[in-house]
């Protein structure tokens, strides 16, 4: 029994530091904001390595036993009274309060149940549900309402009438009245706007061809509102198109328009009333011709100076066998930009192809008309098989000798037109008409019936002469020269245009703007024109020929 070693519990060594209360020491305020919850390793038994023995230090009890000190009880009482009445330093106390505030505001141990919601969302784990973690749930539960009572600065009774106290400062009637007033004003403006469009012009909706167009009174056609794009369009009669709808296509009514004005605007409607007419941009108003035979109303014509509209629709045109499209040296039409006048059974400026007697099938009963003067320069596409055109070709061959004589005279006249296009227009027109007097009075009578009659206005130039007889004043070539100014160079030189329509061959002297043609191409085309002269009259497509006339 004596061999059994007894277990001795060794007392606490003096070298181990004693655990003191942090609130007792005034120097422990820097650790007050830390959490009080101890670490789990505090309860673990750990053996400290005592390789180097700590410095020996006597404890207070041992020192009291070894070195007793006589303490006066009066001093103890006085010290107790001092600590009870005296406070710590104000700076240390302020630091303590700040540390306590930081601990309870930022490092809260238990959050409030009715505080702000946490940003963490519950994770959805369908395989299992952990009872230890409340954040891991199988499905999202709806938030629960928690009734909490707290004391506020302002305490209100249960039966407190908030509207009675704050009703004078919060009025919803004023806001409602303002909204109602704004709505009424906007509805009034909308109503006026809609009434104005309903009563007059329905410009918001484009017109369709199947509307009741014949029911409109013919007098209302003169009140159509149109936008004058160019001052040169003043006085051009608007034709009645064959289609009932505006078209933005460059090909309008068998007339190709290479102008920006071919795109029509849907803002101008068919039924625009006089009260809603657009302002006329030019002091010269647009003259419009009314066609009683046409059942459709007039459509607007947005043109440029190089795109002349069709005239009156009372002319019987055989459109099945002709192609009035211009295929020439310029994308701009070679038409004269000057104004035309409406007339009965007269020439129609649908396209430059109608100027030629070959392609104009209007004069069916005039078979004794001969070509005595040359046509203006333009490129024709003749695919017609009209018998009258073939008869005209036979007369044209007999007048080739006279055409060659008039070449030199017209070349001199063209030079005068380039210098002065004002007064010389009428004089040159008279000279050209005097050359045609030796053809007979019958021919002159037919020429007057198909000629453009000039008015009293001296500013307006001479109109194009007969399309049936082929006599054209040299002013037309000058007009075409002016209409082609957009192409660049205006330096004229005398050339001769060979127009081969398949039925006849006659040279036309005009002022050409083809500056880029070389001498090789001119000589080749001259050979082609001689071969076309020797060939008999047969139907084929028109090819423009340009060669230098022999001097």
Swiss-Prot record:
InterPro entries: Aurora_borealis_protein
UniProt feature, compositional bias: Low complexity: 201-215
GO biological process, alphabetically ordered: cell division; regulation of mitotic nuclear division; regulation of mitotic spindle organization; regulation of protein localization
UniProt keyword terms in alphabetical order: Cell cycle, Cell division, Mitosis
Any single Gene Ontology cellular-component annotation: nucleus
Biased composition range(s): Polar residues: 382-393, 463-474
One term of GO molecular function: protein kinase binding
Comp. bias intervals (Acidic residues): 434-458
Protein name as annotated: Protein aurora borealis
Gene transcribed to yield this protein: bora
């Amino acid at each position: 029994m004596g061999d059994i070693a007894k277990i001795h519990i060794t007392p606490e060594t003096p070298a181990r530091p004693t655990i003191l209360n942090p609130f007792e020491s005034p120097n422990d305020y820097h650790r007050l904001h830390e959490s009080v919850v101890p670490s789990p390793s505090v309860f673990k038994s750990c053996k400290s390595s005592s390789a180097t023995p700590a410095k020996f230090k006597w404890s207070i009890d041992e020192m009291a036993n070894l070195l007793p000190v006589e303490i006066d009880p009066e001093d103890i009482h006085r010290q107790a009274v001092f600590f009870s009445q005296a406070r710590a330093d104000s700076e240390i106390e302020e630091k303590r309060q700040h540390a306590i505030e930081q601990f309870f505001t930022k490092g809260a141990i238990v959050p409030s149940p009715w505080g702000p919601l946490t940003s963490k969302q519950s994770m959805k784990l369908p395989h299992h549900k952990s009872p230890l973690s409340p954040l891991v749930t199988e499905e999202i539960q709806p938030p629960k309402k928690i009734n909490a009572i707290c004391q506020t600065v302002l305490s209100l009774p249960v039966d407190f009438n908030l509207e009675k106290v704050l009703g004078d400062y919060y009025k919803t009637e004023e806001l409602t009245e303002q909204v109602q007033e704004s709505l009424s004003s906007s509805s009034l403006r909308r109503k006026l706007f809609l009434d104005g469009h309903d009563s007059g012009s329905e410009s918001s909706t484009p017109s369709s061809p199947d509307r009741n167009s014949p029911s409109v009174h013919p007098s209302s056609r003169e009140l159509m509102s149109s936008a004058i794009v160019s001052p040169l369009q003043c006085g051009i009669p608007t034709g009645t198109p064959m289609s009932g709808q505006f078209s933005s296509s460059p090909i309008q009514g068998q007339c190709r328009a290479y102008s920006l004005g071919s795109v029509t605007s849907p803002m101008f409607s068919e039924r625009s009333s006089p009260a809603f007419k657009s302002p006329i941009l030019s002091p010269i108003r647009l003259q419009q011709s009314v066609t009683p035979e046409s059942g459709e109303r007039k459509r607007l014509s947005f043109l440029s100076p190089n795109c002349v509209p069709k005239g009156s629709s009372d002319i019987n045109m055989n459109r099945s066998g002709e192609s009035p499209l211009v295929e020439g040296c310029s994308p701009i039409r070679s038409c004269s930009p000057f104004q035309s006048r409406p007339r009965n059974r007269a020439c129609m400026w649908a396209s430059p192809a109608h100027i030629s007697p070959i392609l104009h099938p209007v004069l069916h009963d005039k078979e004794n008309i001969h070509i005595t003067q040359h046509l203006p320069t333009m490129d024709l596409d003749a695919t017609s098989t009209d018998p009258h055109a073939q008869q005209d070709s036979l007369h044209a061959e007999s007048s080739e000798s006279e055409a060659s004589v008039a070449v030199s005279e017209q070349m001199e006249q063209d030079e005068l037109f380039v210098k002065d296009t004002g007064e010389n227009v009428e004089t040159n027109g008279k000279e050209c008409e005097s050359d045609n007097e030796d053809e007979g009075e019958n021919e002159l009578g037919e020429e007057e019936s198909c000629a453009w009659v000039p008015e009293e206005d001296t500013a307006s130039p001479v109109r194009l002469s007969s399309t049936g007889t082929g006599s054209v004043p040299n002013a037309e070539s000058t007009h075409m020269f002016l209409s082609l100014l957009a192409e660049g160079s205006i330096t004229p030189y005398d050339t001769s245009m060979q127009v081969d329509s398949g039925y006849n061959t006659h040279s036309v002297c005009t002022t050409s703007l083809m500056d880029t043609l070389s001498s090789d191409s001119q000589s080749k085309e001259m050979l082609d024109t001689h071969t076309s002269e020797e060939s008999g009259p047969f139907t084929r497509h028109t090819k423009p020929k340009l060669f230098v006339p022999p001097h």
